[in-house]
Amino acid sequence: MTGPNDWNAGVVAEFRKNHGKVGGNFEGAPILLIHHNGAKSGKQRVSPVMYLKDGSRYLVFASKGGADTNPDWYHNLIANPDTEIEVGDETISVSASEVTGKERDRLYAKQASLFPQFAEYARKTKRKIPVVEFKPK
């Protein structure tokens, strides 16, 4: 595998083969797959990301490992918020929206307390890492 799309494809295949479980960097972490359409291209994509469950909401963090830009999936979800996620063996129709303000800060702090790499991602970048919630339809 040579690029991020190849890497994602490998993680997606492993996720589906193992009922939502993957190894490598994601081993033991809660992972979901985001289906998203390219904001410009319209091309359908699938991205594996760590999530936090909060009631009926699934929350994801557009950290991109602390890079100075948001991941493509974030821009795609803002442009096309009605989508699907895969959690384990289940595919769920959801609507995506950004969480802001104190609620965003609370949720990001919770994720960072569970997975300290998220605190490191926040230290590495000048941007405020977006938190996106998926609410089942």
Give short role names for the model-derived ranges:
Residues 31, 128-131:
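Short hydrophobic/aromatic beta-strand or adjacent loop that forms the aromatic wall/cage
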Residues 34, 132-136:
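Short beta-strand element of the conserved SAM-dependent methyltransferase core
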Residues 1-9, 36-40, 82-91:
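N-terminal short leaders/motifs
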Residues 29-63:
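Short beta-strand segments
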Residues 63-118, 124-128, 136-137:
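Short, structured beta-strand-loop surface elements
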